[in-house]
Curated annotation (Swiss-Prot):
Record's function text: Negatively regulates transcription of bacterial ribonucleotide reductase nrd genes and operons by binding to NrdR-boxes.
GO biological process: negative regulation of DNA-templated transcription
Keywords: ATP-binding, DNA-binding, Metal-binding, Nucleotide-binding, Repressor, Transcription, Transcription regulation, Zinc, Zinc-finger
Protein name stated in the entry: Transcriptional repressor NrdR
Organism: Ruegeria sp. (strain TM1040)
Domain of life: Bacteria
One GO MF term: ATP binding
Family in the record: Belongs to the NrdR family.
Renumbered zinc finger spans (unnamed): 3-34
Keyword Cytoplasm: no
Cofactor requirements of the protein: Zn(2+)
């Protein structure tokens, strides 16, 4: 692992343990060249995924991009950050275990929306507004109306 301080490629692992999410390994490293100490996280990647964008363009799957978009939709929501991390790891595992290396961005969006709907409806609507490209307040209203269960008949 390259030292982020001096660029030396010969660093030493001083401590290694499971991370809080129990999906990755946290390693404390030391650089003998500059004395710098830093932490790295390592996680299993089952396969290299490629995202097929709606315009047909292909790009490597970026877990960080997925995480950023989910965290933006979750801003200022009363959801435990560890729960968000678990959700993201679950989404990535689901994508990796689909058996396909090429995954349409639409499929990723559907999986994310499914997960968000179970955790926080406000984050779900926020994500949907970007994913479904809402253009006006009516788009929000229609979407939220679909979420509401039908009113019971009055007697």
């Amino acid at each position: 692992m390259r030292c982020p301080f001096c660029g030396n490629v010969d660093t030493q692992v001083k401590d290694s343990r499971p991370a809080e999410d129990h999906v990755s390994i946290r390693r404390r490293r030391f650089c003998p060249a500059c004395g710098g100490r830093f932490t790295t996280y390592e996680r299993v990647q089952l396969r290299d995924l490629v995202v097929i964008k709606t315009n047909g363009k292909r790009e490597d799957f970026d877990r960080d991009k997925l995480e950023r978009s989910i965290r933006i939709s979750m801003q200022k929501r009363p959801v435990d950050p560890e729960r968000i991390d678990q959700m993201i790891s679950g989404i990535v595992r689901r994508l990796e275990s689909m058996g396909e290396t090429d995954i349409p961005s639409k499929k990723i969006g559907e999986i994310v929306m499914e997960a968000l709907a179970r955790i926080d409806t406000v984050a779900y609507v926020r994500f949907a507004s970007v994913y479904k490209n809402f253009q006006a307040a009516d788009d929000f209203e229609d979407f939220v109306h679909e979420l509401r269960p039908p009113a019971p008949p009055e007697s």
